[in-house]
Amino acid sequence: MCEIDLSNYHEPKPRRALQILWRVINATLFKMLVGSPLRDMRNLLLRAFGAKICWGSIVYPSCKIWAPWLLEIGKNSCVGPHVQLYNKAQITLGDNVVVSQGSFLCTASHDISDPRHSLVVAPILLDDGVWVAADSFIGMGVH
């Protein structure tokens, strides 16, 4: 069995203050904006934190988004209920994309060949018309 020493592990935390502010808003205000009439308000909140979201797209209030500033959503796309977007790298959804309920999109992992298990990231790009089935996992580097 391999022994792992993580005492020297360090992960850079760019935009730490912004990240903390967003996490508070995502866990509170964003989740309170329930219903179709408030979807534009949710999108405005995401845009205020740097997301690029085309009009006509829906992001459900129960979604958990790590970094809106690394998120781009095309026209008429939908990020369904309880979806998690762990985007330490860019996530781009094309036009008419559906990410169904409970799905997890993850742009990060750790390099297990490195004794320090350093963080590795790669973007996710879902082209126009992609449908991600419920409770799916989409890993880093998927295109």
Model-derived segments and their meaning:
Residues 1-51, 55, 129, 142:
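Terminal amphipathic alpha-helical/low-complexity segments used for targeting or macromolecular assembly
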Residues 36, 48, 68, 88, ...:
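Residues at secondary-structure transition points
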Residues 55, 60-61, 66-67, 74-75, ...:
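Left-handed beta-helix
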Residues 110:
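Histidine-centered active-site/metal-ligand motif
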Residues 113-115:
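A short acidic, helix-capping loop that chelates divalent metal ions and anchors anionic groups
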